[in-house]
Amino acid sequence: MHLTAENLAARRGEDLIFVNISFHLAAGEALVLTGRNGSGKSTLLRVVAGLLKPEKGTVIFRDGEGWKDRHPGEASHYLGHRNAMKNELTVAENLEFWRAFLGHPTAGLPLEEAAEAVGLSGITHLPFGYLSAGQQRRIAFAKLLVAHRPVWILDEPTAALDASADRLLAELITAHLAEGGIVLAATHQPLGLENVQQMKMTGFAGVDHGVWG
């Protein structure tokens, strides 16, 4: 299983945000994007997720079953700044919608198990809008667990989380990688992960590569 981006360029309005960005991730690997606001982190994530058309370049996901090339959007979870949940629906109703929309009903954790995995068991009957900002973000992560997809694309995943939730998030990502998943994340702070690739976005000037470990 591989996720490959080659010579990507993207615009915001009339302006080029970045050019010639390439990376390659195999099963069990993660790439963390860092850089100042406006440097193109979120734009790159949206391009890889298939939510924004690149100015040039290609993104290919190749699965391990017959080595079929697919667009990453067909095999990925995208978690943006917003949680993509309806406040008036219960937690269970929100998660059930995403499970049906994103994957096979049996290819993921049951709803209560997913809620327990993010430390919020016993609240799936509550309206999503009743939850605190931190609880809402945790439930957004439960969405990744109820429908299995091998690629996680995460934009500032620690937003609204406290230190204990940060650690829980790191554990979830580590477990996903250990199972052969791929993670592409943008953040302003370390995610508590070991031996992951790092790409520092510097806007149109380019990117710098490194490794956190």
Where do the protein language model's features map onto the residues?
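Conserved ABC transporter NBD signature motif
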Residues: 54-74
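A short, proline-enriched helix->beta-strand linker immediately N-terminal to the Walker B motif
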Residues: 146-150
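Hydrophobic anchor residue at the start of the ABC signature
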Residues: 141, 180
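Catalytic Walker B motif of ABC-type/P-loop ATPase nucleotide-binding domains
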Residues: 152-156
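Conserved ABC ATPase "signature" region
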Residues: 96, 108-123
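Conserved ABC ATPase signature
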Residues: 127-134
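Q-loop/switch helix immediately C-terminal to the Walker
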Residues: 82, 87-102, 110
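Helix-to-loop junction immediately C-terminal to a conserved catalytic motif
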Residues: 49
